[in-house]
């Protein structure tokens, strides 16, 4: 008996069409010392399990650390003016990084959430959008000191109807990618040959 075909995901049309040029890559974002400090902090104990990017009941779950900002949909009773302060209390090395980014690459952006995801071997995400608001952005940082192509774990971006790939971004160490939250994207599975947790650090922002 043949398995039922998978349904192609369809997403609401955004306010503007997107292309690969909307996904901006910044390499060598931090000094080696600051990169190591961020990675060591993220790789320390304190992970919780159960995060997911696809709301389906059988969606893959993975590890996460929430540092500051909104946890769900932005309607929580949290003082947005305190996000950067809260980040400094919860994750000093990450707050130091945010201070650098907010005065350079992300000048004019306001922090709405900061968290980290951890994917072990065999784990993967689900195709999703972070927001449908044009002024909302997602920034993904890859903090590892090294990564091998055989480890996989690329971040893949799709067209709005999910029918084709816009871009596939390699998790190159010390790389930051910035993109509109409305672009559908997914963290691809981690190879069984990967001996470490694939860690990504996210800054959600608005302009």
Language model regions located:
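Catalytic core of non-heme Fe(II) oxygenases with the double-stranded beta-helix
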Residues: 95-207
């Amino acid at each position: 008996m043949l398995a039922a075909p998978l349904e192609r995901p369809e997403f609401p049309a955004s306010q503007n069409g997107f292309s690969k040029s909307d996904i901006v890559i910044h390499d060598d974002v931090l000094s080696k010392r600051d990169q190591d400090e961020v990675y060591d902090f993220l790789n320390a104990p304190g992970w919780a399990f159960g995060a997911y990017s696809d709301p389906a009941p059988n969606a893959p779950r993975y590890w996460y650390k929430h540092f500051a900002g909104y946890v769900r949909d932005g309607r929580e009773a949290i003082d947005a003016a305190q996000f950067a302060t809260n980040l400094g209390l919860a994750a000093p090395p990450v707050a130091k990084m945010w201070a650098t980014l907010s005065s350079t690459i992300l000048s004019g952006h306001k922090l709405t959430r900061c968290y980290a995801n951890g994917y072990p071997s065999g784990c993967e995400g689900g195709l999703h959008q972070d927001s449908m608001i044009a002024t909302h952005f997602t920034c993904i940082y890859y903090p590892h000191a090294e990564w091998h192509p055989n480890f996989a774990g690329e971040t893949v971006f799709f067209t709005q109807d999910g029918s084709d790939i816009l871009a596939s971004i390699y998790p190159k160490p010390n790389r930051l990618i910035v993109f509109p939250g409305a672009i559908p994207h997914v963290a691809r599975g981690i190879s069984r040959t990967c001996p470490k947790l694939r860690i990504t650090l996210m800054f959600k922002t608005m302009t």
